[in-house]
Amino acid sequence: MDVEMRKVKFSEYFKNRIKDIPFAVMCALYMAFCVGCMIYSAVELGARDALLAVVYMIFIPAVFVFEYLIGFRVGYILTVLIIFSACGGLLGSSYNIYMILPWFDSLLHAVSGILFFAAGFMLAEVFFGKDNVNKHFFGKLAFAIFFSTTVGVAWEFFEYLISETMGFDMLEDAMVTDIQSYLLSQSHNVAIELNDITQTVITYDGGKEEWVINGGYMDLGLYDTLNDLLIAAAGTVSIAIVSIISFYKFPKFNKMFIPELVNNRRKPIEATASAADTAETAEAVDDGVAKESDNLSDSVSDNVSDTVKDND
């Protein structure tokens, strides 16, 4: 007999989810960090950075919403990576960490490749199902790799659009000392090479103002975009290799890292007292009918036997 199920309300799911103490503590610390950044930014830095802190606060509620809608559970490893990536993005954008630690942006993009690989693998489990895990593992792996690289490209599109439409410089500039350009020669057959560039002079405002850049020629985001894509792809491929090794040698790691599909949105409906009473009554009636039928059958059998004896 099929058990009737009911949909779990988001509030009920949320209450059960935060009973996971380590997960709840990590989420609470992250939210406190964002609130602190928002207050500090509003007082010391300006409205832009305060708004950015508010935007980053959405990350944790988004995790709860996606968990509930899709039906998966984020493990501790992935939670730490999500929080690290979000905190790093906020610190880099508002507190000049990208300038203090030039390699920090590359680290965040490598982590993003790992995160989106995990998300892609989880979505593959939604599509392929959790059955026959060994059979579909490499199909899920390929899907996760393609998903992660696609999201990486989409993110670079997003950075470009924000930079062009809202005036945020999301494309990090780079200083280069050597360039090759067809534009300088006005021909696609000959590329002009400029080597050992030490200074760039920019004349602007109709020739009234001049800005001198020492140290080379400033590239406006091309190197940053390609470097971000390569680093994210490297992070994706690295975690894919780790997942393959874990699949054969350490399967517990994949279970800890990949979001787990769980049935957290539906639960059995408990029988009410009236329903239970109805069931018991129906069962009693069935038993009574069966006993009455047996008694009638025995009576008929006895009558037939007596008739046969009298005839004899």
Locations of regions flagged by a protein language model:
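Cytoplasmic-side transmembrane-helix entry/capping segments in multi-pass membrane proteins
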Residues: 73-84, 106-108
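Aromatic-anchored segments of alpha-helical transmembrane domains
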Residues: 32-38, 83-95, 149-153
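Short, highly charged, low-complexity non-transmembrane loops/tails of multi-pass membrane proteins
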Residues: 253-277
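Membrane-interface helix-boundary motifs at transmembrane edges
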Residues: 16, 66-77, 130-136
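Short, hydrophobic transmembrane alpha-helix segments
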Residues: 38-51, 63-72
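Membrane-interface helix caps and helix-loop-helix hairpins in membrane proteins
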Residues: 42-47, 94-104
